[in-house]
């Protein structure tokens, strides 16, 4: 990879922190959210061409909808459950949890707590939705270890809920380089990510990410 960066996925990061694995000298993680069909159409061939891997976090309700009524349109279509399972099996994509149906911007921003919502009501809503997605992923042979916050909207308490449900990590939308620390599982939560707007070239994006 350009500049000797090597792609890793969440399994690599988790193994490193737990003392069960190593990371390359210059690790980088490619992440794709929502589960768009164009990840299969365009990204998979490129990952194969350049011998890379990536993390894909689909929204379960979108996957259900397009499984019931497939529409392989690269502009707006989403992947089916069968396609997600095939991507996981390919070894190029690692599938994670992006909520079942908490990807909205109405009274609740993503999976965050609504204004005036009690702590217990929020815990129930968040955990029920997350567990529903976990069960669907598992039904299709996918065991997600990481929660990818919709819109990066994070509320107090959600991290504890994720740990109680057995998650080992979470991805935020905070634009920062993450530091993983061996023996410190907390360093796997709210990992930073840099959004790549279409208007930037790869060179411009890398300069922004590295602070050059």
Task: Go through each PLM region and give its residues.
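Active-site beta->alpha N-cap acidic-glycine motif
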Residues: 3-92
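C-terminal active-site subregion of NodB/CE4 polysaccharide deacetylases
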Residues: 1-31, 37-38, 94, 103-212
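Aromatic-lined glycan-binding groove of carbohydrate-active enzymes
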Residues: 84, 93-102
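Active-site-proximal loop/turn and secondary-structure-junction residues that shape catalytic pockets
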Residues: 60-62, 99-101, 153
């Amino acid at each position: 990879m350009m500049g000797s960066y090597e792609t890793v996925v969440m399994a690599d990061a988790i193994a490193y922190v737990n003392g069960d694995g190593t990371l390359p000298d210059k690790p980088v993680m490619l992440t794709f959210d929502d589960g768009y069909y164009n990840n299969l159409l365009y990204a998979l061939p490129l990952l194969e061409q350049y011998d890379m891997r990536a993390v894909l976090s689909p929204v379960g309700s979108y996957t259900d909808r397009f499984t019931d009524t497939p529409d392989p349109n690269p502009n707006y279509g989403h992947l089916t459950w069968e396609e997600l399972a095939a991507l996981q099996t390919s070894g190029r994509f690692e599938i994670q949890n992006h909520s079942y149906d908490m990807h909205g911007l109405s009274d609740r921003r993503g999976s965050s707590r609504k204004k005036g919502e009690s702590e217990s009501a929020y815990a129930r809503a968040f955990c029920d939705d997350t567990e529903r997605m976990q069960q669907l992923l598992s039904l299709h042979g996918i065991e997600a270890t990481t929660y990818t916050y919709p819109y990066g909207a994070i509320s107090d308490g959600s991290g504890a809920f994720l740990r109680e449900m057995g998650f080992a990590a979470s991805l935020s939308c905070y634009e920062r380089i993450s530091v993983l620390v061996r023996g410190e599982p907390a360093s796997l939560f709210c990992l930073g990510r840099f959004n790549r707007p279409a208007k930037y070239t790869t060179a411009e994006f890398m300069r922004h990410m590295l602070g050059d």
